[in-house]
Design a protein with these regions (language model features):
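Hydrophobic/aromatic residues in alpha-helical transmembrane segments
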Residues: 37-38, 75, 156
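Aromatic-anchored segments of alpha-helical transmembrane domains
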Residues: 3-12, 57-66, 102-112
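Membrane-embedded alpha-helical hairpins and interfacial helices in multi-pass inner-membrane proteins
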Residues: 20, 70, 95-173
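Interfacial aromatic-anchored transmembrane helix boundaries in multi-pass membrane proteins
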Residues: 14-23, 57-84
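Hydrophobic alpha-helical transmembrane segments
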Residues: 1, 28-32, 48-56, 70-75, ...
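Membrane-interface helix-boundary motifs at transmembrane edges
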Residues: 42, 86-95
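Hydrophobic transmembrane alpha-helices
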Residues: 1-49
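Transmembrane helix-loop junction
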Residues: 43-44, 81, 85, 162
Length: 174
């Protein structure tokens, strides 16, 4: 519940960021927070499906800004969940938690937002992705920024939970 409320509070800057017409700029605004809270949730609830459920909660908060975001959040959580469980087989290690947590926002940004615009209106997509005006520099920089912030958020969330478990504030529920 606390993580859900915190995700809602951290998304309050989205109306201001959404008015900037740059591909993925909204994802830069939420990449750190979403990955951080995803790592906190996965460290507390170490069960398969936790990433998908928390992604759906995230999508419910973002459906106000764009109705397709709940679908993108679900797919991003599913991709992270499947890759994390295929590689690590469980969420027992903090590396698996961090790995799974950093996939949600980049998958949404890199793949599905661009694909959505390409399918809905190819001409509008070229303008939205700034492929006609600024070349490939702006989408590439934004994408790298989103990936870096997602990794930083997942790392911070994982380190916070590890510290809380070591200090005895939280008890591991494996």
């Amino acid at each position: 519940v606390v993580a859900s409320v915190a995700m809602l509070i951290t998304c309050l800057d989205m109306p201001f960021i959404a008015s900037i017409p740059v591909f993925g700029i909204g994802m830069i605004g939420i990449a750190f927070q979403v990955s951080f809270f995803q790592a906190v949730i996965l460290a507390k609830v170490r069960k398969p499906g936790a990433s998908i459920i928390s992604s759906l909660v995230l999508g419910l908060f973002h459906v106000v800004f764009a109705p397709q975001m709940i679908l993108f959040a679900f797919i991003g959580g599913l991709v992270g969940e499947v890759l994390g469980l295929l590689i690590f087989r469980s969420y027992k290690s903090y590396l698996s938690i961090g790995f799974t947590s950093c996939f949600l926002v980049p998958v949404i940004t890199l793949c599905f937002v661009a694909l959505y615009f390409m399918l809905m209106s190819p001409a509008k997509a070229m303008d939205h992705l700034q492929l006609t005006n600024a070349g490939w520099i702006i989408p590439t920089c934004v994408t790298l920024g989103v990936v870096a912030l997602s990794i930083a958020g997942a790392t911070c969330g994982t380190l916070l939970m590890r510290t809380l478990y070591k200090k005895g504030v939280l008890h591991e529920s494996l």
